[in-house]
Each structure stands twice: as structure tokens, then as C-alpha cells.
């Protein structure tokens, strides 16, 4: 999923450049683990508008976090986590971005991270039982919850949860049967990017992504992932209401077939299918991309490199994501994982992590702590109205997510098969 967000260390630092200047396939796990041991690294304290090294020993008050005393007392000494690139940083990529060292100092839990490249890989890794927890996207969370790989959590053990934006709590991608299964990390929308010379009057519609005859024909950039089928369904929601689609992740066979047919027709106008967002940013800069689906952080970087582009969330709405930190049912170090989940969602750490990656924080107090004072405005962190027509990535299931019981919906495994056939 978005995750060919598979940014290597150098790619992950792309969002640092932004701050300074203003598809899954069924793959086998790869050996890309990294052990984070930062005992000799000076932790970084961030205040609004600047990034400076901390002058005090890491502690609860400095980092706006008071861990649950009982959980802290049971800390095992280490934690093994599967995470997206850029979500767990110890200062080795960029010294000023280090939210691992303070955590290790406060909790005595050494952080060991296995970087995941795709949601499918991360599900496989969690099924191995070797990891204590994971940062999971919505196309993985349902599989993990229904498969018994992750545990229901006791919110009383998480002191940071009260400050999470209400719009991220109790959602289908982080809860099951009304019970919480994780802590929200952040959120982002998949926005429309367009070349301002090709569209001097601006754009407020996804039409150039789907319809022939626009100036963007042949220069359309498409996200290369099965979850993009939801984007096709979103367009059909707006343009073919007779199909009855009310949720782009709840498609019966007729609706699904219509989405695939639309994607097949899109091939004639597409100029690029992207998974590596650095490649897409290059297309924005060199002008070979005239319209596309992107993430705001990619557009920010490209604009800083001189790309003549603008972004918008079109009138039809958009898909998006909200990742969730989850605890393994087989965790060997459950208390250290609980502490990490609470820490990474606390104001200071959440501000650091989400600004580094380029997304809206999940903790409302984090907005006062980002190095770029405009970060939360740029990513609409506090604008709940912005998110009302953003359909967060969710795993499609046979049980229709829109509440219908008279039909069976197409499960995500079939989305993967259909996408692979389309791209073949």
C-alpha cells in the first residue's frame, strides 16, 4: 500500500527537505531489519519554529509524557517492532530527528525495528510471532485483527490517548466489534496534483485522471497498488450513482467489475504508475506529470525543487490513510510495546515522527511542537471538516462494510488478484 512508501533512509529524509524549505504485491519478507541502540546519541528537544539539541537529561516533563506506572514497572528491557520507514528514528539519519533515545532512556526498553516495505510483508512478519507490535495501515489492520495477530488494548494503560483527535478514534481500521485494537499514529489524504501551466485555471475534479480528452492525457500519474481500486470506486460514486456505491471499500461484484473496467480504460491515458514517490516527484519537476494522485509531502518536495504544480482535494473527495500502532497477541515484550505505543502518540514524539514523515499528527497537542510552525495547517491536522470526505484506507471484506447484508462484497485478496492482472 502506500507503502511503497518504501523509502530507504535517504528517501525518508525527503520530508526533512520539505521542512527546511517551507501496491502491494504478495512478497516474501526481506532482510532489512535495523537495531536501534542510541545510548550515545544526544536527544533532540524541539520547540515551535526551531530544532535544537536538548540541554537536559531525557525525562517525562521534558518530553510531555508520563507513562503508566504499572506498565513501566513491568518493562522487559527491549521491544521488537515492525514499522514503516521513517516511523522509528534514532538520529542516525538526521541527528535532529531522534525520538528513540529519549524513549529508551525513560523506559529502559531498547528499540529494535524491522522495516517493512509493504502491508502484505508486514502482515507476514506479524504472523511469524517474532515481533511485539507493528505500525499498520488500513489495508493490513483488518487482516491482523480478524486473524488474531493483534490484541485488544486497554485504553487506561495509554496516558496519551485522551489527546488523540476524536476523528481518529473508534474507526473500522483500528477497532473491531466496538473494541479498540490500536493507537492512531497520523493521517493523510491522497490529493490531486496538477501542472499549473497545463491547468492555469486550477482543478477541482479528478476528471483528468479518468476521462480522455484533457490536456493531461498521456501524462497522468497513477498510484500502483491494489488499494487504488478504491479511487476508481470513489469516482464512480460521483459519476455513476446508479451503481449504488456508498463506500469505496464495499464493492459487490457488479460494482467491483465497473471499477476494474474504469481502471482498464485509464491505462490509455496514464503515463506513469508510481510506487516510489521520489520517482513521481521527479516527474513533477521535469514536467512529464500533468495530473496525478500524490501525497502532500511529495508535492511539497517537488515544489521546493521548482516544480510548477499545485494540489487540491477535489470536490468528489479523496482516499487517504491513518496508520495504527498495534500490539501482537504473541508479544514477548508486551509492556515495552505498550510504552512505545503510548510514547509515539504523545505530543512531543508524535510531532517529531509525523513531521519527519510528512503527515498530520494524531495528537492535538503536537501541533504546538512541530519545527515548522505551519506543519499542521499544511496537513489539515486540526481541520476536521477537511476529513469528512476522505475515505481512509480500509481492508475490503466479504461482509460489506457499508452495512448491506443481501449481497457479498469482493474481499481484498481479490483486489490484489485483479490489480496484478491489470498491471500484467
Question: Which residues fall in each region the model found?
Answer:
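Conserved C-terminal helix/tail region of periplasmic/extracytoplasmic solute-binding proteins
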Residues: 282, 388-424
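C-terminal motif of bacterial Sec signal peptides marking the signal peptidase cleavage site
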Residues: 15-20
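Mature extracytoplasmic/periplasmic domains
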Residues: 327-393
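Bacterial lipoprotein signal-peptidase II cleavage site
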Residues: 21-31
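Extracytoplasmic ligand-binding site segments that recognize negatively charged/polar headgroups
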Residues: 80-95, 130, 135-283, 288
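Early extracytoplasmic/lumenal segment of secretory-pathway proteins
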Residues: 21, 58-143
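Periplasmic-binding protein-like
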Residues: 160-163, 260-266, 305-329
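A bilobed periplasmic-binding-protein/Venus flytrap-type ligand-binding module shared by bacterial periplasmic
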Residues: 191-198, 234-236, 321-333, 352-356
